[in-house]
């Protein structure tokens, strides 16, 4: 059965780079469906880019997606090839460059500035939530925290931001805000939202 939100139909190849994928028993399905590498190095990105460019015109290259999971702060340095690739990946016929991290500030400024879509799950560290608000709150004109609370209330829910349009969603389906406007009537208290109080070390 073709799962994973139809990724096999959307892309000719999906490349997943993860330091921990072999420690996750549920990842066996990903390993069957996609190209999976254990870890990250700048050379991997260079090889992918060169391979894509070897097809000549962009339209002749395979349409690919790259997912980098849990690689930040380990093998990834500032000004890495991944950061550089973020500014030119569409020229290599890469339709998706997704980066998952548990440490927001470990993401290079270049990557953050070139992000068109942001997914934020419920945070357990107050300082990290503040950093995310500092980064993206201006787009939502002081309503970021309220949108976060509405979106992440409930198990497994997340806040999805479309930076180019200023739209905010609960998960992918329900639009809850746009720039400084909240489009739903519900309001969530800090206690109900489980806002973090731990600032970390």
Model-flagged regions — what are they?
Residues 15, 33, 44, 53, ...:
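Generic alpha-helical secondary structure signal
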Residues 129-168:
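P-loop/Walker A phosphate-binding loop and immediately adjacent motor/lid segment at beta-alpha junctions
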């Amino acid at each position: 059965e073709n799962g994973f939100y139809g990724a096999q139909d959307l892309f000719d190849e999906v490349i997943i780079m993860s330091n921990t994928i072999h420690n996750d028993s549920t990842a066996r399905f990903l390993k069957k469906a996609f190209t999976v590498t254990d870890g990250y190095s700048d050379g991997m990105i260079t090889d992918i880019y060169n391979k894509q460019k070897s097809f000549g015109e962009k339209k002749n290259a395979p349409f690919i997606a790259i997912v980098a999971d849990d690689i930040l702060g380990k093998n990834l340095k500032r000004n890495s090839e991944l950061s550089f690739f973020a500014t030119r990946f569409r020229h290599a016929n890469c339709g998706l460059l997704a980066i998952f991290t548990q440490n927001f500030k470990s993401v290079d400024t270049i990557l953050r500035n070139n992000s068109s879509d942001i997914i934020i799950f419920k945070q357990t560290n107050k300082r990290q939530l503040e950093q995310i608000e500092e980064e993206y709150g201006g787009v939502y004109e002081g309503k970021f925290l309220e949108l976060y609370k509405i979106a992440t209330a409930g198990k497994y829910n997340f806040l999805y931001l479309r930076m180019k349009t200023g739209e905010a969603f609960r998960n992918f389906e329900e639009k809850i805000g746009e720039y400084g406007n909240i489009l739903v009537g519900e309001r969530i208290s800090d206690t109900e939202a489980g806002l973090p109080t731990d600032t970390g070390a």
